[in-house]
Amino acid sequence: MSRHKSKSIPGRNLRLADQIQKDLAGIIQREIDMTRAGLITLSGVELSADYAHAKVYFTVLGAEPDTAAALLNEKAGWLHSQLYKLLHIHTVPTLRFVHDPQITRGIEMSVLIDRANRPGPHSGVPDEPEDQS
């Protein structure tokens, strides 16, 4: 006999990930003193297929990403318990905070592009011709 497979609800994973991101951002902003960790922005949540684990991606301004990750992961158990109070689901995922390097790379690329477009001898963009009148 074959076992009945449960079918996941389409889009549930994305909706739950978005809700976890919103709730965590609010909890962190209201309840945790993150002055040592700089300004933290949650950039996304990735859930495992069984909803048991969540990678929470963040960016940080004004501090080292490793310091912020250590502080957030130190608070992960408490944040999990706070999420349990807010989410009405059977299993609240365990949280693991991971620095999101894509935002930082995007900023670095933007700086490089701006620098390359700046007029000057080493920029690749010719200087403006001087008015000879």
From Swiss-Prot:
One of its GO terms (molecular function) is ribosomal small subunit binding. It is found in: Cytoplasm. Transmembrane segments: none annotated. One of its GO terms (biological process) is maturation of SSU-rRNA. Keywords: Cytoplasm, Ribosome biogenesis. GO terms for cellular component: cytosol. Monomer. Binds 30S ribosomal subunits, but not 50S ribosomal subunits or 70S ribosomes. Belongs to the RbfA family. One of several proteins that assist in the late maturation steps of the functional core of the 30S ribosomal subunit. Associates with free 30S ribosomal subunits (but not with 30S subunits that are part of 70S ribosomes or polysomes). Required for efficient processing of 16S rRNA. May interact with the 5'-terminal helix region of 16S rRNA. This is Ribosome-binding factor A. The lineage of its organism: Bacteria, Pseudomonadati, Pseudomonadota, Betaproteobacteria, Burkholderiales.
